[in-house]
Amino acid sequence: MNIFDEIGDKESVFKDKKYLDHRFLPDRLPHREEQIRSIAKYWVEALNGVTPPDITIYGKTGTGKTAVAKFAMKQLKEASKDCDVNIRTEYIRCTDYTTEYQVIARLCQQLGRDVPYRGWTKAEIVNTFRNMFKKNAFGQDMILMVVLDEIDILLRNDGDGLLYTLTRTDNVSILSISNYVEFKKFIKPRVRSSLRDREIVFPPYGAQQLVDILEERSKMSFKEGALDDDVIPLCAALAAKEEGDARYALDLLRTAGEIADERDSDKVLGDFVREAKDYIEHNKITDIILTLPSQQQRVLEAILYLTKRKEEITSGRLYEVYKEIAKGDSVSYRRIFDFINELEMLGLISTNTVSRGRGKGRTNIIDLQCETSLLEDSLWGV
């Protein structure tokens, strides 16, 4: 028997796993109706031929930002079929397109212009893009709603040139998405003043809200009776502790189901959820560390060294050890503070400011937030 047929014929707790993928866009987004309506009240202006204001949405990972933006795009596209306005919506993930040139080239291609991803000057690509917003053959102005997901990554990598170009192009409205509430510090005042964006905050999901989301998805994903009663509440409770991360909750539920299949169990048990948690945490931290820039990996290496020596880790002591590890290829002391903030934002370390007493000032104490063995495995593969 063919091995793929044999595996495919095995009994499974799943009906269809795709509904547990965070990229799946359902017909309803529980507990995000208010945020959808907030976007819609601005974007509705496009249906009347008016370019909507720019929007920025903030929130931690897994709070529904991308799903809500795509849901609003889908709804606007459907509504625009019945009006005499040329509305286009385009989604750009800034982890895939990390420079102004790449984003503008991608937009040109999506809008019907065959332009190269390299080889043209910046002026050529920008002019080609802007010329698309002149009257078309039918005498209609095109209004473009462009969603820039994880925009902080592009801003750190390439500066604010993209926002400068887009805010100075007629009939373009920007919806920026960021996990990082302070990403605007990467935007120069002249660009920030022309952005004039409306801000929408996405709060973390609560445990009961996560239960509601998981129950809807599980009905489409699992066979009837395949989930033990405590599975969904446990997934929701664990995800609520992870700052209300719905993506994490879905990963837990899917991975627990996969463990059930591996064990030839006809039921997903709470113990499988706990195993899934350990598996996901290990892989998540490893993936984060492996994708860090080399200088940040060296900072982590220095923190690991000091942690294993049970030393108190101050920023000054950290910089001393980091310079020894970097061996002449080190960054400035000020830059280390940026790295510390970014590593804390990723959940790999924590910082605590303590007072040294009268006249001695205050000091940042740094603590590692993952197991030393896991960090060693990730950094050195031992």
Curated annotation (Swiss-Prot):
SUPFAM superfamilies: P-loop containing nucleoside triphosphate hydrolases (SSF52540), Winged helix' DNA-binding domain (SSF46785). ATP binds at T63, G64, K65, T66, A67, Y205, R217. CDD domains: AAA (cd00009), Cdc6_C (cd08768). Keywords: ATP-binding, DNA replication, DNA-binding, Nucleotide-binding. GO terms for molecular function: ATP binding; ATP hydrolysis activity; DNA binding. Coiled coil: none annotated. Autophosphorylated on a serine. Phosphorylation is stimulated by binding to MCM. Both single-stranded DNA and double-stranded DNA inhibit the phosphorylation reaction. Disulfide bonds: none annotated. InterPro entries: AAA+_ATPase, AAA_22, Cdc6_C, Cdc6_lid, ORC1/CDC6, Orc1/Cdc6_arc, P-loop_NTPase, WH-like_DNA-bd_sf. Pfam families: AAA_22 (PF13401), Cdc6_C (PF09079), Cdc6_lid (PF22703). One of its GO terms (biological process) is DNA replication. It comes from the Archaea. The N-terminal AAA+ ATPase domain and the C-terminal winged-helix (WH) domain are both required for DNA binding. Belongs to the CDC6/cdc18 family. NCBIfam families: orc1/cdc6 family replication initiation protein (TIGR02928). Monomer. Interacts with MCM via the WH domain. Involved in regulation of DNA replication. May play an essential role in origin recognition. Binds to DNA, with a preference for origin-specific double-stranded sequences. Does not bind single-stranded DNA. Inhibits MCM helicase activity but does not affect its oligomeric state. This is ORC1-type DNA replication protein 1.
